[in-house]
Structures are given as C-alpha cells and as structure tokens.
C-alpha cells in the first residue's frame, strides 16, 4: 500500500507529506479507488504510462491541498497569539499598575500643556518673527500661519463679544422703535377722533367742502417736460414759416418769368419793320 502510494505521488509530481495526519486519513478513506486507477496506468510491457487524471483523483488532490493550506494558516495564527500573550506578560512583569497610572497622568499633563500655550510663549514667538522672516524669506506663509495661530484665540473671543454686544443693541433698538410706533398710533387716533368731534359740534356749517384737485397741480411739470414742449413749439413754428417763405418765393419767380416773356415779345414786335441788308443781298444773288 505504501509503495503504491509513493509511486503515485512520484508520477503526478507530488511530494510526500508525512507529518500531516489529515492526508493519511484522506488517503485511507479511498484505498479501493486508488487500486482501481492503477491497472489503467500500466502498459503491456510492464512500464507505467502517463494517463490523464480522472475527476475523482482531481477532487482528492484539491481536498488535500485545502487541508494543508488550512493547517498552515492555523499554525501561523497560533504563533501570533502566543507572541502577543508573551509580550503582554513581559509588560505586566516590567510595570506595576501604580507605575502605569503615573505614566498615564504624565501623558495627560504633557498633552494639556501642549494644547494650552501661555501668553509669554506667544509674545516670544511674535518678538522673534521679524528675525525669522529675514532669515527665511521664502517661508513667509509659515510666518503668517504662526501669527494667525497665535492670535486666533484672542480674536475669536473679541469677535464673539462684539457680536453679542451688537445683537443686544439691535434688540434694544427694535423694541424701542416698536414701542414708539405704538405710542404714535395711539396719539394720532386720539387726536383725530377729538378733532372730528370738535368740528362736528362747534362748527354750525359742518364740514368744509373739500377743494377739487387740479390736474396741473397733481401732474407737476418737470424741467425736461418744459424743454420738450418748447422744442416742439419751435419746430412747429419753423415748419409754418418755411412753408410761407417757399410759397412767396414761388410766386415771385412766376411774376419775374411773366415779365421777362412780355419784354421779349415787345422787342420782337418792334424789330419786325426794320430792313436788313443781308436779306437784300441774298435776294440779288438769287436773281
């Protein structure tokens, strides 16, 4: 049995694992299946053949690999837990609970001192800032950051105080204005009612008639409206005057043309009875 198992492992490229009990148990569950696979792997000459693995053998190999990996993981976890326990035991042996309490108190003191800076340290930082700025010219952003970190607490407190004062003042002003408006409304209502009653009972004629509102008074003319009105008036007058001048010029031109025509006709009638030498010469030449 062992010999056959060793030969099978050699053929499939497996190494023998002797220190794992799970592998031996898994192989003992299926001895008959292993014997059934052997005759197919043997050739007629007596040598072993490289036959393909059947699905049953593949399943067995997968199961063996999984068990081996699980065992490795469990072993590592056990080693880690042992190391942690040993380290905790060493710490407990080195420090007593009183010393641990003292260490915790010192740590808390250091943290509180670091978080709360004194004003003297802040003033020292502010005093040393010009030197820092001169020596580290490119690190001006760091200097500004230090200034802001040093003064942010005081500025925040001042801002909160100013905001609270402003809010209180605004509330007081709003309450005073509300009270004044209420008083004014009451006084107006009282005076108006008393005035009306006096007029009703004292005046014999009753209420005086209300004057009708004038449209001109309601719609008061502005300077621009006045200027526009003047411009329109001038334009209308200029257009009328231009029309009159054009008609006058047209009539005068007609009269001048008629006079010229009459003069030309008179001249032509006067020149008709005169003898012209050119006519006589022309007649003699024709004869």
From Swiss-Prot:
Record keywords, A-Z: Growth regulation, Nucleus
Region Disordered, annotated ranges: 15-36, 71-99, 236-280
IGT motif, short sequence motif: residues: 41-47
Biased composition (Polar residues): 237-259
Biased composition annotated in UniProt, kind: Acidic residues: 81-97
GO CC annotation, single: nucleus
Phenotype of gene-disrupted mutants: No visible phenotype under normal growth conditions. Roots of plants lacking LAZY2, LAZY3 and LAZY4 exhibit a negative gravitropic response, and grow upward in the opposite direrction of root gravitropism. Increased branch angles of lateral roots and reduced length of primary root.
Tissue localization of expression: Specifically expressed in roots. Expressed in root tips. Expressed in the endodermis of inflorescence stems and hypocotyls. Highly expressed in the lower hypocotyl and root stele of young seedlings.
Entry annotated with the keyword Nucleus: yes
Keyword presence, RNA-binding: no
GO biological process: gravitropism; lateral root branching; regulation of growth
Function, as annotated: Involved in the regulation of root gravitropism. Functions redundantly with LAZY2 and LAZY3 in the control of root gravitropism. Involved in the development of the root system architecture by influencing lateral root angles and primary root length. Functions redundantly with LAZY1, LAZY2 and LAZY3 to control plant architecture by coupling gravity sensing to the formation of auxin gradients. Involved in the establishement of auxin gradient in primary and lateral roots upon gravitropic stimulation. Involved redundantly with LAZY1 and LAZY2 in the regulation of both shoot and root gravitropism.
Family statement: Belongs to the LAZY family.
Protein's name in the database: Protein LAZY 4
């Amino acid at each position: 049995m062992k010999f056959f198992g060793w030969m099978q492992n050699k053929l499939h490229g497996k190494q023998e694992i002797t220190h794992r009990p799970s592998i031996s148990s898994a192989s003992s569950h299926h001895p008959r299946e292993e014997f059934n696979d052997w005759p197919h792997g043997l050739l007629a000459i007596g040598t072993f053949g490289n036959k393909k693995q059947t699905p049953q053998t593949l399943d067995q190999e997968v199961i063996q690999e999984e068990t081996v990996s699980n065992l490795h993981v469990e072993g590592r976890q056990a080693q880690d837990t042992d190391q942690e326990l040993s380290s905790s035991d060493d710490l407990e042996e080195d420090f007593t609970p009183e010393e641990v309490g003292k260490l915790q108190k010192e740590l808390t003191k250091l943290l509180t001192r670091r978080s709360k800076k004194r004003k003297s340290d802040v003033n020292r930082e502010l005093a040393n800032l010009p030197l820092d700025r001169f020596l580290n010219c490119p690190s001006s952003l760091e200097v500004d950051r230090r200034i802001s970190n040093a003064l942010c607490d005081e500025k925040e407190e001042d801002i909160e105080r100013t905001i609270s004062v402003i809010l209180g003042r605004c509330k007081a002003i709003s309450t005073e204005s509300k009270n004044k408006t209420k008083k004014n409304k009451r006084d107006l209502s009282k005076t108006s009612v008393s005035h009306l009653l006096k007029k009703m009972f004292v005046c014999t004629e009753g209420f005086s008639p209300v004057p009708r509102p004038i449209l001109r008074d309601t719609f008061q003319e502005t300077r621009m409206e006045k200027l526009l009105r003047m411009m329109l008036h001038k334009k209308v007058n200029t257009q009328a005057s231009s029309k009159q001048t054009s008609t006058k010029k047209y009539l005068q031109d007609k009269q001048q043309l008629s006079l010229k025509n009459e003069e030309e006709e008179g001249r032509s009638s006067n020149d008709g009875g005169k003898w012209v030498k050119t006519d006589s010469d022309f007649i003699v030449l024709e004869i």
